[in-house]
Design a protein with these regions (language model features):
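Chalcogenol-based redox active-site neighborhoods
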Residues: 1-171, 179-183
């Protein structure tokens, strides 16, 4: 595992178009379903990264707290030939075991990860209801082994401010985690 930081996609960027399979129900899920409805949180994650695993419970809490007003979508873009634990069957099992209820999409071509300029897992991209990027970066400043309590403060603050119509600080911190496993 190589510790990698996110590249911080430019704020105001439009959400890239995607149409990917949701491994939970095997149906196609398109970004067009998110257009001009409510805000969206796209999370680039995977199954095996300790930095993603570190946030499983907090991710469930954030989804519980904001899921009625923000569409949550997780995407895994890792190479499954060399990392079979990140394959669709394992993705589905993980989400069902965790009790997560939002789509978990498989980006087999890695095109969406590239469009988002994703570098690591996890990365979080919060889009307003016009599909413009308003937050990108970390969930909080905790990480495996640093003894800082998981709070989700950075991501929670961005979600709260977006929903309240308040300004989201442009002073945002990159996420850090495992590098995306490119083909």
């Amino acid at each position: 595992m190589a510790l990698t930081y996110s590249s911080m996609l430019e704020l105001g960027s439009k959400m890239p178009h995607f149409e990917l399979k949701n491994v939970i129900d095997d149906k196609m899920y398109a970004s067009t379903t998110l257009l001009n409805k409510k805000p969206s949180l796209i999370m680039v994650i995977c199954n095996h990264c300790p930095y993603v695993i570190h946030y499983h419970e907090e991710l469930k809490k954030i989804n519980h707290d904001f899921g009625d007003n923000i569409d949550f979508v997780a995407i895994s873009s890792n190479d499954i030939i060399n990392y079979p634990q990140d394959g669709p069957k394992q993705m589905k099992k993980l989400f069902l075991d965790l009790g997560l209820s939002f789509p978990y999409l498989f980006d087999e071509t890695q095109d969406i990860a590239k469009a988002l300029k994703a570098e690591c897992t996890p990365e979080f991209y919060l889009y307003d209801n016009k599909n413009m990027l308003v937050y990108r970066g970390r969930m909080d400043n905790s990480s495996p082994g640093n003894d800082i309590e998981i709070s989700g403060n950075d991501l929670r603050s961005a979600c709260t401010n977006l929903l309240n119509g308040s300004t989201i600080s442009s002073n945002q911190h990159p996420s850090m985690g495992c590098n995306i496993k490119w083909k």
